[in-house]
């Protein structure tokens, strides 16, 4: 027998399920936020801006497909760090696909969607973009750990890599699925977002806070990576001659430029959207006109998925060569096992070991044995 206390819960669940299939809810929420009139006046098929955005998304999809093909076809890239780069390419590819679908289902088509379909349309974007940002954080964590240990990760660390990658997707799915699981404003019209009329403002604030913390974490990790490299470079100046010290300083400056590019692009792509979402939380309905231009801010964040393959892949010399071979429809190299394997530590940086690292001699202090060399943004550790 169902208890009296559970009856309200059952009724609420039934009401929520019925609301998810109610077409009128979309119209009601868009009308409340002022987006309904905008849609009626301007939406006559696909807008020119939408066509441009779709073309950009197609380019993003293609370049990330080539990155995945490069990693898949090149055996020497079947290593933990490249799994992270492959995961980033996959999430960026899905971001391009999700935004293309979002654009095709926008405009007048929006009012033909049920709330459940609307949540899937927007939630897929949140999942893909969240996975992309979490992947950037995972890469920063992996490279920071690599710098701390000053040695290549062996196969035993594959489990940690897959654990981090799995965590990226699980957290992203949960984050993107919260609205359809109940954290929405269907029953509270006054709490609705203007940018996303079925999303609760508290959810928007929560997501903005999470992404801001991720951004700060990535900035801190890359600053720490540069600090570690700079510190080890200074140690060498006390043991090497003036010419080597000067050369080390120049290469450290090149590394700093690489870090600045990475962080500047990331902040430039995401900060405008963060600011817009904070305005959305603070503004009442129909009071902030800038909120009706949200697609320009969102496409800027999606553009980050187009810059990631350039920054995180093509700055690696070996990946760049393999990438060009894939594009040229040539066979990918099987990899020279006798050669040095280079692993990126930060974008545009590669990490390698000399053969003497495999000797039976015990490892000495950083200042005694491993010489940290920074050239053109590439970091190598050699004996």
From Swiss-Prot:
Pfam families linked to this entry: 7tm_1 (PF00001)
InterPro entries tied to this protein: EDG1, GPCR_Rhodpsn, GPCR_Rhodpsn_7TM, S1P_rcpt
Positions annotated to bind sphing-4-enine 1-phosphate: 121-122, 266-270
GO BP terms in the entry: actin cytoskeleton organization; adenylate cyclase-activating G protein-coupled receptor signaling pathway; adenylate cyclase-inhibiting G protein-coupled receptor signaling pathway; angiogenesis; blood vessel maturation; brain development; cardiac muscle tissue growth involved in heart morphogenesis; cell migration
Residue ranges with Basic and acidic residues bias: 352-367
GO molecular function terms noted in the UniProt entry: G protein-coupled receptor activity; G protein-coupled receptor binding; sphingolipid binding; sphingosine-1-phosphate receptor activity
Transmembrane portions of the chain: 48-69, 84-105, 118-139, 162-183, 198-225, 259-279, 291-311
Name of the protein in its database record: Sphingosine 1-phosphate receptor 1
Species in which this protein is naturally found: Rattus norvegicus
């Amino acid at each position: 027998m169902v208890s009296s206390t559970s009856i309200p819960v059952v009724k609420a669940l039934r009401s929520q399920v019925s609301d998810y299939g109610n077409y009128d809810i979309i119209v009601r929420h868009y009308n409340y936020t002022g987006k309904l009139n905008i849609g009626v006046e301007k939406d006559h098929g696909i807008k020119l801006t939408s066509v441009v955005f779709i073309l950009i998304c197609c380019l993003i999809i293609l370049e990330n497909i080539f990155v995945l093909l490069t990693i898949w076809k090149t055996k020497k890239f079947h290593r933990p760090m490249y799994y992270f780069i492959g995961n980033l390419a996959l999430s960026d590819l899905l971001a391009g696909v999700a935004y293309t679908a979002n654009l095709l289902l926008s405009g007048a088509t929006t009012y033909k969607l049920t709330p459940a379909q609307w949540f899937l349309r927007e939630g897929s974007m949140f999942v893909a973009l969240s996975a992309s940002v979490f992947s950037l954080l995972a890469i920063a964590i992996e490279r920071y750990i690599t710098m701390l240990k000053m040695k290549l990760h062996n196969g035993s660390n594959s489990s940690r890599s897959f654990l981090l990658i799995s965590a990226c997707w699980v957290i992203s799915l949960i984050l993107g699925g919260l609205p359809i699981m109940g954290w929405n404003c269907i029953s509270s019209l006054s709490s609705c977002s203007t940018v996303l009329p079925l999303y609760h403002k508290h959810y928007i604030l929560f997501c903005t806070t999470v992404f801001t913390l991720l951004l700060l974490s990535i900035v801190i990790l890359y600053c720490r990576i540069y600090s570690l490299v700079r510190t080890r470079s200074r140690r060498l100046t006390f043991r090497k001659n003036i010419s080597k010290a000067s050369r080390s300083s120049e290469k450290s400056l090149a590394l700093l430029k690489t870090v600045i590019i990475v962080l500047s692009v990331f902040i430039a792509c995401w900060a405008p959207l963060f600011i817009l979402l904070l305005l959305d939380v603070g503004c009442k309905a129909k009071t902030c006109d800038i909120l009706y231009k949200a697609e320009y801010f969102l496409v800027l964040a999606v553009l980050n998925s187009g810059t990631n393959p350039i920054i995180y892949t093509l700055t690696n010399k070996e990946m760049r060569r393999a990438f060009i071979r894939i594009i040229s429809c040539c066979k990918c190299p099987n990899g020279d096992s006798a050669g040095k394997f280079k692993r990126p530590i930060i974008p545009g940086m590669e990490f390698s070991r000399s053969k003497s690292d495999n000797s039976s001699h015990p490892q000495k202090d950083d200042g005694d044995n491993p010489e940290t060399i920074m050239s053109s943004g590439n970091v190598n550790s050699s004996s």
